């Protein structure tokens, strides 16, 4: 296994100084206390005392002794000499003239301070630590090198040579990898191994291997596509490998191995050693079995949605065609009924008078016509759905005979209907009179049960599918073995695991174990806030109480636009003029020189693999994906790092979700250290909003929305932006699903150093359930509601007098629901916090349209209280509303930069599968962050330059600057991956036309 995996930075910094230590480092590692001075004082001569003192500091700071004292920075030498009262540090030249002196001093320091050589048992302990980390995760060897270095220094082990450590890490990683391959290869029986080997051969009806065929998921939404998806899952399931055999194997490494199997070619797999080949095939089958089941159920859900949507379209067209007849009949009936209102007509004469106007037979025909074409208020075009039965019967047998559904208590009725249809659908019976009727709602009843009181085959089947879709989406019905459609409740903390972590979870979330204490605190907050806002309402010119409508409501005046002072305009202009022009290619390489983000990209299967100029290849691939232009414009046959083969190899082996996420975290964390970014915000506030992209290719991971996608389908990239303008997470959503399902996911799943505690969204992200979950998890939810004044304000004290707010505080909370479910609420929140279950999946299961569970009701009750607290703050505080608006505007402006970057192919995403979409949009977020970071660095340099020129800068103006500009960045045309030597060494490029800028100043 390759051992040359260290970056240049790691090689140069290992056991060496790379610059002057800062004041904190000097105080921590080079400060000499009285005991140190007593030990040092035993040496004779200033040169020996200074030399041994410096060696003490070096072994503390570097983990090793230096042989050449000239490599110690001047600041360290002076700092140490001052503590010893040595004025002339040139005496250090006399130190170590005898080689034995240095060796003797090193031995004395090791003995006195208990430093140890890198030998048994410490080699064994470090090897065990590295092996454990290598076994449970797929960490880069460079990261393990840093971990090992830190561990050695922590345990006062003198650092060995860099090659010794890299060789140990490579050997340990290889041993862990071989163990994984061996365990996986032993899972299948001899017969199963033979079947797995057949994956590499061609199928009967295609030149493609069976493995390549199974890699291809569904891309269309139709009955045949669903049947093919089910057959694909059955093929994988028939291998008989079971996921329970993997309980002792590391999930992360299995996932990476399976992903590698999905990316690499059959030719490469066939060339592997027998053990590795079998391990790769086993990992592929187990991972793709779950994926194939998820894909099939995704197609089912999308297909049912299409049936419902088509039924609605047909119904609306019918409605339009029948409106003329309905209007004519309605007018005739209105005229007939008007006779009933005539006071002068005796009751016994009314029928005769009506029939004189409209003959009895004609009136009966009109009534029949109205009943046929008029729709009840609860009609959801179910009649048109029944007409889709021909489409349904093409795929329903596959569904009923193949997929094994399970249910929670709320889904038992749906499961009973499913079991019934599984038995009876193959028959030719036209009536299912013995079918379970609990699923038949009032709106379906007239279409399922005919006039003769028979349950029709067509009506019952479509009624069941409608109920099945709703139950699946809410996970009342679920499929064991599926990742996306499984039971989220089974993943919550429970049993002994919950009891062991219960108190820790309560403490980490900041909630008391006694629900009465929590309710008392909430009640006090709500009561005091009501009274404070009521007392100031008459002075609040932006809010008025409107009692003219059926219900009192508040009218909130829109915020006035914030004027830009002349000083801000001038400052923005000066900074814009100073920003140097740059190609996006160079920008990426320069940001890598600052942050080393390219080091986070490692090979999917061989993490130690290194090639020359890899950052150049990675930057090219990132640009190809983010700009949506493909690799072709970036290929340079005369540049080894940019050849077609190199770029394709880099994209296949280095670009994936985990590496993109890690690289993005580096950029976000670097941005957080910049003084200018810290002026904009501390990283505690963020916003979430969606970017819409048309997907003109056939894919199941897209949805319709005429407003955003026209006649096409599309996806939403729901991304999260901090108050420092950095994007720290993104989620790909098919179509335009409710934002509220995903808003918490960005906070809980993000992997940067930021810790946002407050998030702003638009109205679509707001719901009482989300307010409740935010509070349980310790976050502040601050949406911009479209009509906050018309919202329901809730109270906990029924008899409290809130003065002018009494009329709007008309909702009465029920704390008893919270008390009953308090422990369950904390268990759910703790499971989310610990990553046991995905937020969006759990929220779907909680959002029940019918009969919400006690847990859901309790979370909603808490949400109502916290939503009311938010509303009271919102109407009372102009600055709060302004802060929300400002942060949301930052997100929208960042989208504009991302649009400018993603300019190729009309900005349309043409990836067919979810992984590809997520990788491409993750790359777009990464490159956008690189642009923001580059702008921030140079804006800081421009501000420093202006100050040096004597400009007086206003702090308020600086706080309103934005790095979301891109006019100076070339994203089109010639692409060159070269850096000036000055920038390569870590310096900034000169500001544009500095002399002219000085004249302006």
Residue map of PLM features:
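Long amphipathic alpha-helical coiled-coil/heptad-repeat bundle
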Residues: 2-524
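Short linear interaction motifs
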Residues: 32-41, 601-617, 668, 741
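Contiguous, well-ordered alpha-helical segments that form the cores/surfaces of helical PPI scaffolds
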Residues: 56, 159, 194-198, 205-208, ...
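Short, conserved catalytic/metal-binding motifs centered on acidic residues
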Residues: 63, 634-635, 686-692, 759-764
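Structured, charged N-terminal subsegments at the starts of enzyme catalytic cores
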Residues: 528-637
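Active-site cores of enzymes that catalyze phosphoryl transfer or operate on phosphate-rich substrates
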Residues: 590, 594, 598-600, 610, ...
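Catalytic or ion-translocation cores adjacent to nucleophile or general acid/base/metal-coordination motifs
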Residues: 635-674, 705-823
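Long, compositionally biased intrinsically disordered regions
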Residues: 807-1001
């Amino acid at each position: 296994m390759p051992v040359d995996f260290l970056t240049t930075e790691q090689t140069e910094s290992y056991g060496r100084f790379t610059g002057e230590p800062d004041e904190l480092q000097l105080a921590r590692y080079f400060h000499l206390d009285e005991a140190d001075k007593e030990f040092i004082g035993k040496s004779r001569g200033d040169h020996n005392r200074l030399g041994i003192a410096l060696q003490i500091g070096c072994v503390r700071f570097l983990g090793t002794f230096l042989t050449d004292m000239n490599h110690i920075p001047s600041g360290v030498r002076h700092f140490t000499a001052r503590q010893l009262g040595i004025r002339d540090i040139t005496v250090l030249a006399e130190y170590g003239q005898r080689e034995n002196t240095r060796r003797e001093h090193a031995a004395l320091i090791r003995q006195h301070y208990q430093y140890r050589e890198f030998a048994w048992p410490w080699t064994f302990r470090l090897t065990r630590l590295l092996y454990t980390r290598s076994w449970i995760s797929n960490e880069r060897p460079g990261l393990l090198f840093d971990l090992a270095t830190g561990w050695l220094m922590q345990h006062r082990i003198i650092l060995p040579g860099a090659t010794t450590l890299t060789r140990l890490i490579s050997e340990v990683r290889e041993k862990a990898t071989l163990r994984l391959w061996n365990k996986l290869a032993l899972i299948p029986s001899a017969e199963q191994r033979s079947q797995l080997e057949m994956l590499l051969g061609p199928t009967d009806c295609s030149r493609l291997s069976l493995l390549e065929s199974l890699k291809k998921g569904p891309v269309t939404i139709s009955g045949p596509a669903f049947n093919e998806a089910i057959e694909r899952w059955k093929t994988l399931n028939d291998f008989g490998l079971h996921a329970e055999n993997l309980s002792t194997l590391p999930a992360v490494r299995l996932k990476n191995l399976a992903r590698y199997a999905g990316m690499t070619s059959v030719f490469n797999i066939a060339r592997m050693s027998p053990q590795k080949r079998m391990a790769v095939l086993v990992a592929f089958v187990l991972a793709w079995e779950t994926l194939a089941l998820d894909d099939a159920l995704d197609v089912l859900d999308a297909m049912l949605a299409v049936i419902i949507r088509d039924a609605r379209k047909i119904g609306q067209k019918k409605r339009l065609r029948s409106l003329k007849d309905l209007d004519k009949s309605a007018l005739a009936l209105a005229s007939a009924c008007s006779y009933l209102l005539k006071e002068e007509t005796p009751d016994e004469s009314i029928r005769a008078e009506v029939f004189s106007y409209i003959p009895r037979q004609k009136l009966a025909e009109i009534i029949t016509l109205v009943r046929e074409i008029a729709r009840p208020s609860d009609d959801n075009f179910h009649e048109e759905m029944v007409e889709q039965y021909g489409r349904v019967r093409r795929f329903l047998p596959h569904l009923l005979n193949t997929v094994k559904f399970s249910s929670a208590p709320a889904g038992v009725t749906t499961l009973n209907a499913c079991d019934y249809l599984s038995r009876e659908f193959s028959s030719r019976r036209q009536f299912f009179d013995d079918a379970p009727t609990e699923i038949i709602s009032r709106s379906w009843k007239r279409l399922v049960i005919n006039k003769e009181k028979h349950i029709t085959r067509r009506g019952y089947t479509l009624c069941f599918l409608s109920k099945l879709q709703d139950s699946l989406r809410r996970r009342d019905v679920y499929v064991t073995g599926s990742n996306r459609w499984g039971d989220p409740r089974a993943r919550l903390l429970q049993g002994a695991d919950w009891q062991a972590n219960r108190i820790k979870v309560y403490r980490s979330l900041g909630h008391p174990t006694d629900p009465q204490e929590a309710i008392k605190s909430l009640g006090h907050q709500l009561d005091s806030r009501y009274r404070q806002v009521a007392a100031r309402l008459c002075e609040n010119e932006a809010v008025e109480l409107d009692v003219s409508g059926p219900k009192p409501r508040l009218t909130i005046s829109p915020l006035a636009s914030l004027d830009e002072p002349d000083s801000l305009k001038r400052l923005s202009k000066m900074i814009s003029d100073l920003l140097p022009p740059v190609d996006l290619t160079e920008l990426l390489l320069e940001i890598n020189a600052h942050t080393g983000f390219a080091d986070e990209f490692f090979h999917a299967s061989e993490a130690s693999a290194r090639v020359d100029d890899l950052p150049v290849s990675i930057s090219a691939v990132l640009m190809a994906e983010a700009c949506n232009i493909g690799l072709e414009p970036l290929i340079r046959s005369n540049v080894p790092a940019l050849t077609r083969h190199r770029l394709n190899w880099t994209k296949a082996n280095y670009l994936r979700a985990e590496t993109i996420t890690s690289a993005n975290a580096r950029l976000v964390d670097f941005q957080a250290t910049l003084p200018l970014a810290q002026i904009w915000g501390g990283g505690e506030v963020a916003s979430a909003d969606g970017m819409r992209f048309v997907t003109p290719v056939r894919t199941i991971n897209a949805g319709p929305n005429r407003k955003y996608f026209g006649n096409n389908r599309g996806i939403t990239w729901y991304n999260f932006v901090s108050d420092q303008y950095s994007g720290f997470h993104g989620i790909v959503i098919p179509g335009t699903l409710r934002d509220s399902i995903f808003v918490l996911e960005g906070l809980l799943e993000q992997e940067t150093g930021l810790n946002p505690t407050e998030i702003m969204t638009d109205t679509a992200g707001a719901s009482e359930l989300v307010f409740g979950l935010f509070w349980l998890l310790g976050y502040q939810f601050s949406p911009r509601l479209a009509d906050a004044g018309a919202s329901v304000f809730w109270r906990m004290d029924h008899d409290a007098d809130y003065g002018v707010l009494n009329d709007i505080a008309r909702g009465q909370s029920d704390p008893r629901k919270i008390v009953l479910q308090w422990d369950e609420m904390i268990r759910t929140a703790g499971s989310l916090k610990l990553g046991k279950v995905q937020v969006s999946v759990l929220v779907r299961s909680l959002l029940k349209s019918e009969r919400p569970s006690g847990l859901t009701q309790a979370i909603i009750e808490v949400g109502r209280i916290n939503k009311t607290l938010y509303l009271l703050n919102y109407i009372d505080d102009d600055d709060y509303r302004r802060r929300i608006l400002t942060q949301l505007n930052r997100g929208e402006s960042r989208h504009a930069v991302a649009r400018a970057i993603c300019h190729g192919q009309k900005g349309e995403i043409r990836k067919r599968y979810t992984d590809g979409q997520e990788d491409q949009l993750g790359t777009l977020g990464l490159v956008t962050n690189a642009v923001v970071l580059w702008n921030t660095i140079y804006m800081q340099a421009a501000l420093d330059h202006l100050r040096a020129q004597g400009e007086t800068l206003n702090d308020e103006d600086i706080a309103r600057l934005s790095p979301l500009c891109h006019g100076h960045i070339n994203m089109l045309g010639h692409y060159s991956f070269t850096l000036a030597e000055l920038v390569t060494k870590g310096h900034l490029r000169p500001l544009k036309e500095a002399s002219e800028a000085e004249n302006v100043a």
